[in-house]
From Swiss-Prot:
Lineage: Bacteria, Bacillati, Cyanobacteriota, Cyanophyceae, Synechococcales
NCBIfam families: PRK00143.1 (NF001138), trmU (TIGR00420)
Its biological purpose: Catalyzes the 2-thiolation of uridine at the wobble position (U34) of tRNA, leading to the formation of s(2)U34.
Protein name from the UniProt record: tRNA-specific 2-thiouridylase MnmA
Annotated site residue numbers, Interaction with tRNA: H121, Q332
Record's keyword annotation contains Signal: no
Keywords noted in UniProt: ATP-binding, Cytoplasm, Disulfide bond, Nucleotide-binding, RNA-binding, Transferase, tRNA processing, tRNA-binding
Signal peptide feature range: none
Catalysis: reaction(s): S-sulfanyl-L-cysteinyl-[protein] + uridine(34) in tRNA + AH2 + ATP = 2-thiouridine(34) in tRNA + L-cysteinyl-[protein] + A + AMP + diphosphate + H(+)
GO terms of biological process kind: tRNA wobble position uridine thiolation
Stored HAMAP family: tRNA_thiouridyl_MnmA
Superkingdom of the organism of origin: Bacteria
Length: 358
């Protein structure tokens, strides 16, 4: 019996090749495109057209699933609230969990009677017989690896998901797109968040939802160096665009939403030897009850660094870095790795915890 699979199609080259590969391997493919953003002329419109074109070319059905309310509630509202509270949220991991994979699997199972889904993400999944857990791994192409954004997927979702591109490089993907003669073969990769593509910049997007609120830019002693029009325009570690003159380079060290202040200091002041992580999801291992030695990635393009991860109170972990790290940003994800294997991850806390660990 031919196995069926729902393939998430964004209209880009990666998801197009994922669908074409599975189709060539004998799967009965159903393309599904998520309608994410409200309003006409948004970024998703072109994607819908391109996804439909790919399905027509492959001779497979194409479905459109309306997830606009989910996207509004879980992404737009989440971003606006976070930036307003002085943190820098990571929308992509949140979107993968709450808007893309979960709803797509639910639609596949309940509306189509299909138990497998696939996407064009660069990551790998394997089943560990010893632990009886599905493990999330980095992609073969480390430059395109997207496991950082997928750490929050559940065991149920990993068990049902295929990543056809995980074992190949982006160069091979482009070659396959040409070989399949796909209509998206020459389409450029997206360089920004879909929100930025739709609104021009993150600043423009946030200004649409958050009213200007003037405040002070101060140094670590509290001396006023300048003024700002809203803390949502700033992020930890930021140097450019501060609008203040100083004898030495200054960086954003802290955002204080209570006092509506941007606190700046030298580069060393923007570094930290530890941070706390909440809203944890343990992927490839059960939740640890003792400290573990591993690597952590604290932003998408940063190199992994060695840490001690210590179980803490309130279902948090404390990360102690071997060397101080610059610009640890509350709201971003801290994803733990053992080599290529994603152990788990969570969201960096805005404040340090003071209670002793386990």
């Amino acid at each position: 019996m031919t196995q069926k699979v729902v393939v998430g199609l964004s209209g880009g080259v990666d998801s197009s090749v994922a669908a074409a590969l599975l189709h060539r391997q004998g799967y009965a493919v159903v393309g599904v495109t998520l309608w994410l953003m409200k309003g006409k002329g948004q970024c998703c419109s072109e994607g819908l057209v391109d996804a439909a074109s790919i399905c027509e070319q492959l001779g497979v059905p194409h479905e459109i699933v309306d997830t606009r309310d989910l996207f509004q509630n879980h992404i737009i509202d989440y971003l606006v609230q976070g930036y307003g509270e002085g943190v820098t949220p990571l929308p992509c991991s949140q979107c993968n969990k709450a808007v893309k994979f979960g709803p797509m699997l639910q639609y596949a199972q309940q509306s189509l009677g299909i138990d497998k889904i696939a996407t064009g993400h660069y990551a790998r999944i394997r089943f560990n017989e010893a632990s009886q857990r599905y493990e999330l791994l980095r992609a073969v192409d480390r430059q395109k690896d997207q496991s950082y954004f997928l750490y929050d997927l559940s065991q149920e979702i990993l068990a049902a998901t295929l990543f056809p591109l995980g074992e190949q490089t982006k160069t091979v993907t482009r070659q396959l797109a040409a070989e399949f003669d796909l209509s998206t073969a020459e389409k450029k990769d997206s360089q920004d968040l879909c929100l930025i593509e739709a609104h021009g910049s993150m600043r423009d997007f946030l200004d649409k939802y958050i009213a200007p609120k003037a405040g002070e830019i101060v140094d670590l002693s509290g001396a006023v160096l300048g003024h700002h029009e809203g803390i949502h325009h700033y992020t930890i570690g930021q140097r450019k665009g501060l609008g203040i003159a100083a004898a030495e380079p200054l960086y954003v060290v802290k955002l204080d939403p209570v006092m509506n202040r941007v606190i700046v200091g030298d580069r060393q002041s923007a570094g930290s030897g530890e941070c706390y992580v909440q809203r944890l999801n343990w992927v490839s291992i059960p939740e640890p009850t003792a400290p573990i030695r591993c690597e952590v990635q604290v932003r998408y393009r940063s190199a992994p660094v060695t840490v001690n991860a210590i179980p803490w109170h309130d279902q948090q972990i404390k990360l102690v870095f071997d060397e101080p790290q610059f610009g640890i940003t509350p709201g971003q994800a801290a994803v733990l790795y053992d080599g290529d294997r994603v152990l788990g991850g969570g969201i960096i806390c805005p404040q340090k915890s003071e209670t002793a660990g386990v």
